[in-house]
UniProtKB/Swiss-Prot annotation:
It comes from Burkholderia lata (strain ATCC 17760 / DSM 23089 / LMG 22485 / NCIMB 9086 / R18194 / 383). This is Fructose-1,6-bisphosphatase class 1. It catalyses: beta-D-fructose 1,6-bisphosphate + H2O = beta-D-fructose 6-phosphate + phosphate. Pathway: Carbohydrate biosynthesis; gluconeogenesis. The lineage of its organism: Bacteria, Pseudomonadati, Pseudomonadota, Betaproteobacteria, Burkholderiales. Binds 2 magnesium ions per subunit. Disulfide bonds: none annotated. Keywords: Carbohydrate metabolism, Cytoplasm, Hydrolase, Magnesium, Metal-binding. Homotetramer.
Length: 337
């Protein structure tokens, strides 16, 4: 690709702003700041043990999960990058119990930013791809945010994206007008458009699920996975392969590129907890991206983006990816209702 012909993230967003007239300047600037923060996170991740940021921090987040040093650092990078720009009313993060209002000494904007600063952090110390997930909403109360301001269904998202820190660092984005992927050119520090209008194949022969939990699954999930595992001898009449990275951004990025279905269901171990993944900053942004790429995303019983949130850290079951497979496993759940 000729350097002169490259489309950077900034150029892409400005062109989108001109062509669609539905990408406000403040939203464009906010996306650029998030992308810049992801570059800083990528740099710290890539240093590994040389940066003395591996290992646990000796603390837990609001979910009771042990925090890694890079979890905390990534959270601080996103907060520091976004608090002063005047585009946001408030932020919320997996790593914080309550929301983060923009300090009074900085101007406030009309948007809310919600993020998982470092998804898949159990993989940090073993050099497996991890990432950042984010979602942008409008603040319904103008520039004065409360926790209730964040509790909007995913259909109200105005932008969502993720970064993957792997062999390449990529930034995947939707503003409701398709899905595009940008690759970080480390030599010049720019995000360069490398995939346009990404589309998930409707059919697939790959699935992603943590099979070690099989004994705890409810019947619809067991039925679906058993059919896949039966291969050509089973009711599907075809062989399927399982892929599981234990990093949602990595699994979803693979599905976005070559199809597949990602499943993180509720199970019998914790019947009072509907799933593990968080709605606001994991399931909703990924569902927005997947749907914009022609896929589907459900809880097994309803479209994820139509779930009305009741809390910042609410959890939901997740089934997303190639539409025909998501429709099938969703149908099995609906039969049991």
């Amino acid at each position: 690709m000729s350097i002169a012909r490259r489309t950077t993230l900034s150029k892409f967003l400005i062109e989108q702003q001109r062509e669609t007239n539905n990408l406000p300047a403040d939203l464009r600037l906010l996306i650029e700041v998030v992308a810049r923060a992801c570059k800083a996170i990528s740099y710290n991740v890539s240093k590994g043990a040389l940066g003395e940021a591996l290992g646990t921090a000796g603390s837990e987040n609001v979910q009771g999960e042990v925090q890694k040093k890079l979890d905390i650092l990534s959270n601080e990078i996103l907060l520091d990058a976004n608090e002063w720009g005047g585009n946001l009313a408030a932020m919320a993060s997996e790593e914080m119990e309550t929301f983060f209002p923009i300090p009074a000494n900085y101007p406030r904007g009309e948007y809310l930013l919600v993020f998982d600063p470092l998804d898949g952090s159990s993989n940090i110390d073993v050099n497996v791809s991890i990432g950042t997930i984010f979602s942008v909403l409008r603040c319904p109360d103008g520039k004065q945010a409360t926790e209730e301001s964040f509790l909007q269904p995913g259909t109200q998202q105005v932008a969502a994206g993720y970064a993957v820190y792997g062999p390449q660092t990529v930034f995947v984005l939707t503003t409701g007008n398709g899905v595009n992927c940008f690759t970080l050119d480390r030599e010049v520090g720019s995000w360069v458009l490398t995939q346009s209008n990404m589309q998930i194949p409707a059919d697939t022969r790959e699935y992603a699920i943590n099979a070690s939990n099989a004994r705890h699954w409810y019947d619809p999930v067991k039925r679906y996975v058993d059919e896949l595992n039966a291969g050509k001898d089973g009711p599907r009449g075809d062989n399927f392969n399982m892929r599981w990275i234990a990093s949602m951004v990595s699994d979803v990025h693979r599905i976005l590129n070559r199809g597949g279905v990602f499943m993180y269901p509720a199970d019998k171990r914790t019947p009072d907890r509907p799933g593990k993944l968080r709605l606001m900053y994991e399931a909703n942004p990924m569902s927005f991206i997947v749907e914009q790429a022609g896929g589907a995303a459900t809880t097994g019983t309803q479209r994820i983006m139509e779930v009305q949130p009741t809390g910042l850290h609410q959890r939901v079951p997740v089934f997303l990816g190639s539409k025909n497979e998501v429709d099938r496993v969703t149908g099995y759940h609906q039969e049991k209702q």
